[in-house]
Every structure is written in C-alpha cells, then in structure tokens.
C-alpha cells in the first residue's frame, strides 16, 4: 500500500482496456471489400471446413472475418458489411460478415433465427 507522499508524487495509473475488435475503431460495423474467400479448419477437438474471407476495410485494415450460415455467394471484390464478434475455434478470426447486407445474400430457406442470417419471412400458405 503506497504512502500519501508516494501518491502525491506518482498518482494512480488507470488500467487501459484493450479492444477485442481494434479494426472497427469504435464503430458498430464497417464496409469492406473481399480480397480472398476460402475455407479453413478449426482448432483441436472440432473438425470442419469453416468459410472465411479476408476483407480490406474502408479504414485500411485487413481482417479475417467469418461467413455464418449455410452457403454463400461471396467472391473476390464482393463488398460486405463487417461486424465484431470472434469465432472461438478459429484463431485470428475476430469479425463476422453481416448476412443479407450489401453483396452478401441472406441464407436461403431459413425459418428460425432469420434476423441473424438476413432471411426474409416465408410466405404463409
């Protein structure tokens, strides 16, 4: 425990909180252009081919972001909207691409959790 004299001389240092998604620069979403669309494999106990894209954001950052849902229509030079949010079993993937926005279509035939995948409400029969 410091003395009063030490506190007068030095003062307390405030802990700096490090951002979990620094490329967003405190914005909720960012627009970007896909530079590479590919699949990658997850960490140890899991096994799959996860769809990811390398995206060059409008602020100059180049990030790897995850494409959620079944199937997608992304190619190189597609314009996408990127949000924060990591993928636990993919190291280095700290962002998600927003479905149903800009060039990325929503998930087809999606019935539940539609808002997360940009799917329209199906026609009632």
UniProtKB/Swiss-Prot annotation:
Modified residues (3-methylthioaspartic acid): 89
Function: With S4 and S5 plays an important role in translational accuracy. Interacts with and stabilizes bases of the 16S rRNA that are involved in tRNA selection in the A site and with the mRNA backbone. Located at the interface of the 30S and 50S subunits, it traverses the body of the 30S subunit contacting proteins on the other side and probably holding the rRNA structure together. The combined cluster of proteins S8, S12 and S17 appears to hold together the shoulder and platform of the 30S subunit.
Family of this protein: Belongs to the universal ribosomal protein uS12 family.
Organism: Acidovorax ebreus (strain TPSY) (Diaphorobacter sp. (strain TPSY))
Any GO CC annotation of this UniProt entry: small ribosomal subunit
GO biological process, alphabetically ordered: translation
This protein's name: Small ribosomal subunit protein uS12
Subunit-structure text: Part of the 30S ribosomal subunit. Contacts proteins S8 and S17. May interact with IF1 in the 30S initiation complex.
Alphabetical keyword list: Methylation, Ribonucleoprotein, Ribosomal protein, RNA-binding, rRNA-binding, tRNA-binding
Keyword Amino-acid biosynthesis annotated: no
Top-level taxonomy: Bacteria, Pseudomonadati, Pseudomonadota, Betaproteobacteria, Burkholderiales
Molecular function in Gene Ontology: rRNA binding; structural constituent of ribosome; tRNA binding
Pfam family for this entry, one: Ribosom_S12_S23
CDD domains from the UniProt entry: Ribosomal_S12 (cd03368)
InterPro entries: NA-bd_OB-fold, Ribosomal_uS12, Ribosomal_uS12_bac
HAMAP family linked to this entry: Ribosomal_uS12_B
């Amino acid at each position: 425990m410091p003395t009063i004299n030490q506190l007068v001389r030095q003062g307390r240092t405030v802990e700096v909180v490090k951002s979990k998604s620094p490329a967003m620069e405190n914005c909720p979403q960012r627009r970007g252009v896909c530079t590479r669309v590919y699949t990658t494999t997850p960490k140890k106990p899991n096994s799959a081919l996860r769809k990811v894209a390398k995206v060059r954001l409008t602020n100059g950052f180049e990030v790897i972001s995850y494409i959620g849902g079944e199937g997608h229509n992304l190619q190189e030079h597609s314009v996408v909207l990127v949000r924060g949010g990591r993928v636990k079993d993919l190291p280095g993937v700290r962002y998600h691409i927003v479905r149903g926005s800009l060039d990325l279509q929503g998930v087809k035939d999606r019935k539940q959790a539609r808002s997360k995948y940009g799917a329209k409400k199906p026609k009632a029969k």
